[in-house]
């Protein structure tokens, strides 16, 4: 057991050292998962997701290296790189789509985050209203007062704030009331359970009604099956994200999603045509 623990510790240290070098050597890259209108398939924006291609290990799973980065100061360097690269690439798109970037708890309580984002927006010439910062409930409650201060400063810049993984943290309703949020993202764990668990379905319905009452847009995360999409459409959801609507793609492939001056996902085009033919 001790030997196994020692092996894991050495592996963690190796990954941390390699990640530090990866930032400097340009081994990180971004992929973008579309967020789309459920009824039309029109893409409204993309979420930036960081990937790491190690020269020896190959593709390192985000679930492996991101937690290690979050446990060290490396998440600040990784986070800054992601913000700058996402804004730089989004500024080159031919349509003014939203770009969503996740911010960790460590970044959120960093007193310099708002200034960093302001500097990056000026550097990349990306309009502030196109940048959406995603924060989790866990990040918000790690240091509520500093998180609130940072979010208020971002709001002054014109940046949109979204609560990610809604329902998985603590005191969700109080967080919605106390923090300056512009959007709610329902966690995948609720979406995948809507048909097998009546409670999950009830929670998803309740969140939509809550957001409607507060005037907050809501987006369903992790939609992977036609049944899940059908449920969301039936319940009045308008926006979703997930592999059924589109897998993450590199920046070079975003242009191919443009179709007759309206951005439609390839899988959605087929569905829309099929539904139209059936009517």
Regions found by a protein language model. Give the residues of each.
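Glycine-rich, phosphate-binding/catalytic loops in enzymes
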Residues: 67, 117-120, 149-152, 178-180, ...
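EAL-family c-di-GMP phosphodiesterase catalytic domain
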Residues: 38, 55, 104-111, 130-145, ...
